[in-house]
Amino acid sequence: KNLSGIAKLFVYFPLLGTENFGMDVIFHSKKFFPVEERNGLHLPVSNANVRSKYEQNTQVLDSLTEMVQQYYREHAENITNWVNISGLSFDCEHHKEDVTKDYFRTFKKKWSNFFQNLPMVDFGDRRISITESDIRFFSQEIISDFTDEKAGEVYFEALYDAAIVTNSMVARSEIIAWSNVVASWDELHPSLIGVEEIAKKLGACDNVSKSTLY
């Protein structure tokens, strides 16, 4: 292939951050040792010499992570559309080596915790973090019921109208996208609510019409 016009830095050194890596950040450094796959890190344990090189890759990635997170902390209020850049899709289980699986589980957890504590969700006239608020999102069980184009739209409108009576919710136009983002961090996150919880809260609420309940 003709590589003219492409910076040599991007030709000779691995680039982390493809659509298969697991998040919407590109990590690039000439300090990375080349790996067989450019969309991840692999940590072999059988060869000590090779292992030391791959361990350096994790150190570089951890350092870059701190840099990106510091930038996010400093500019959280100025960054728009967080919902489009904060989802995680790491496939921690496809790696052969347990040490690699463990690393990416930890890496995902680090980013999940970070995003949960960052003021990134627009709520009214302010930005809030998920951890420091009582904001709620739909569980994946509910989201899956919205797939039918016609029935799903009617169900969504009714369920959102019911949920917002007793819960703090993001805007109707963003609730599905944000629900998917939060589930990508943790499918069991306590901010994700299901039909049973919505119905239970409504049932305990005074002055709720039967049309809302049913």
List where the protein language model places each region.
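GHKL/Bergerat-fold ATPase module
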Residues: 1-214
